[in-house]
A protein has these predicted regions:
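Lipid interaction determinants
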Residues: 24-76, 81-181, 192-243
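Beta-propeller blade signature
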Residues: 183-187
Length: 243
């Protein structure tokens, strides 16, 4: 058997193996949901959003939108083992900075944590919204003046979006402090970014509000302009989070 033939056979087997892995390995990127009842029989909705490197989970009353819990940080998937570095946790700040590894199983429409017996259904896979990913607030305009901030500092305001869901979180990894969060659904149509708020940790009266903003991408930055849920003018700059 010639060396050329052997090399060709090895090459074909390698390509076939890579195609097999691609077909049967699933990505968690997108949004997932789970409904369950707490000890009082209250229905709780849990939403997880994965960007390419970051994730967040939020739990809230499925009917009233009352905020209950959130945590999040970075993630990596090796086989069926997911490793997370915790950046915020509303129930236990001492978990901030911890690295946690656990088993997950992912199919096209289900994500399960066997050890916890948690089972999530897929909402989307990162589409169709234009802004899927993790973003950090990097600046804003006040009285026409552009004011920038260092996104490498421990105090961050992050917004993580799938193709249809969003969650913003303000936190400080150095002080292990959680500042606030909110989230819901969003759309991006003809330069308009629209949010429907489903939970808001600081003020539950914001639940159910719909907000519309102008948006565009300039040199990789998300320019976000409109009014806050309080009705105040807003003109923010968000940069895509890399680290």
């Amino acid at each position: 058997m010639s060396k050329k033939f052997i090399n060709r056979k090895v090459w074909l087997l390698t390509i076939s193996f890579l195609l097999f892995i691609q077909m049967f390995s699933q990505s968690p990127v997108g949004a997932w949901e789970r409904y369950f009842q707490d000890e009082n029989g209250t229905e709780i909705r849990s939403i997880v959003i994965f960007s390419e490197r970051f994730q967040s989970i939020a739990m809230f009353n499925a009917k009233s939108g009352e905020f209950i819990y959130s945590n999040g940080g970075t993630w990596e998937l090796n086989g069926n083992m997911m490793t997370e570095r915790v950046e915020f946790d509303t129930a236990n700040s001492e978990r901030v900075g911890n690295i946690i590894t656990f088993e997950v199983t992912i199919t096209n429409d289900k994500l399960s944590l066997p050890e916890s017996d948690w089972h999530f259904s897929r909402i989307d896979d990162g589409g169709p919204g234009d802004l899927n990913g993790a973003w950090l607030m990097s600046g804003r305009y006040r009285n026409g003046e552009k004011q920038m901030r260092n996104t490498d500092r421990p105090r961050k305001t992050m917004k993580i979006l799938s193709g249809t869901r969003f969650q913003w979180i303000a936190f400080d990894t150095e002080k292990k402090e959680f500042k606030g969060t909110g989230g819901g659904t969003y759309t991006t149509v003809d330069g308009k970014y629209s949010e429907n708020i489903e939970f808001f940790s600081r003020d539950n009266s914001r639940v159910g509000m719909s907000l519309e903003f102008n948006y565009n991408i300039e040199k990789g930055d998300w320019i976000h302009k409109g009014k806050t849920s309080k009705g105040d003018p807003l003109h923010e700059i968000w940069e895509e989070r890399i680290k």
